[in-house]
Each structure stands twice: as C-alpha cells, then as structure tokens.
A protein has these predicted regions:
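Acidic, small-residue rich beta-repeat scaffolds with periodic aromatic anchors
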Residues: 2-148
C-alpha cells in the first residue's frame, strides 16, 4: 500500500512495509525531464516503534529494522558489547540490500534466511543469531545458496 502526495517540484510516496514495527518508507521524487529520487527515509506509521512483541521474533524485528534503514532501533536489539562494535555502515554492508526475510526457530537456534536479487537470479543467505538475556550477542553467516 502506498500513498502519493503531490509536491511543488514532484511527489512524495509513503509505502507501508507491513513489518512488526509498522515502518513506512518515504520517497521524495523531483520531476524534471525525468523523475528523480532525491530523498528516502523511514518513518513509524504508528508515530513510534511497536516493539512489544514475542522475544522469539527479535532477529526478525532486527532485520526488518535494517531493511527499513532504522539502524537506531536495530541497534537497540543488540547486546551492549555488540552495539559498541558495529555502526550503521557495518550493518548496512554486512546484510546488504535484501528483498525478504524469513525466521526459522528450531532446537539448534535462531536462523534467518535473507533473499537477494542479483542480476536476475535469487540468492538466499542464512544467518544464525545468538541471543542471551533478550539481546542479540552475535550474528554468524551460514552457507550461501543460489536459485534460478
């Protein structure tokens, strides 16, 4: 779902991400000879993050914050030690620009499958999340899988 608002120089588009925190992405376009994206930022559709969820969903919530470029809220999910080790650039480059995320919880732990589109092919990367005291203490990349 998107909402379009006309501006003096182009338009503003709000797209709901339908994630746990109720993020929306605002894209501002300028209209000249072509339509150009001039700015993009995330907002909370409820005015603030909705972060009172089942803690088993913590890795999913974290990834959805990364996807929405809400790095401040994403870092809130990390342990104090890990929070001090990583910055916005590290998180952004570590996970890249993924299209979808899926969380699997089993007896071995918490695993997230992220799907990326690379040159028309879909690639799935899996990450293992280590959680202690309701915070993420480590994130480990697993084996990469390609699909057609």
């Amino acid at each position: 779902n998107s909402i379009l608002e006309k501006t003096e120089t182009g338009c503003k588009v709000l797209t709901e991400l339908k994630d746990i925190s109720r993020h929306g992405i605002v894209r501002i376009f300028e209209l000249g000879e072509e339509m150009n994206l001039v700015d993009q930022y995330s907002v909370y559709l409820a005015g603030k993050p909705i972060n009172d969820f089942n803690l088993e969903l913590l890795p999913l919530y974290f990834l959805q914050c990364i996807k929405a470029s809400d790095f401040k809220e994403a870092k809130f999910c990390l342990s104090e030690e890990l929070r001090q080790k990583v910055d916005v650039n590290h998180l952004s480059s570590f996970f890249g620009n993924f299209e979808s995320e899926k969380l699997t919880i089993n007896e071995k732990g918490y695993f997230a499958n992220l799907t990326y589109c690379v040159q028309g092919s879909y690639i799935s990367k899996q990450y293992e999340f280590k959680i202690e005291k309701n915070k993420i203490v480590n994130i480990l990349p697993c084996e990469e899988k390609k699909s057609i």
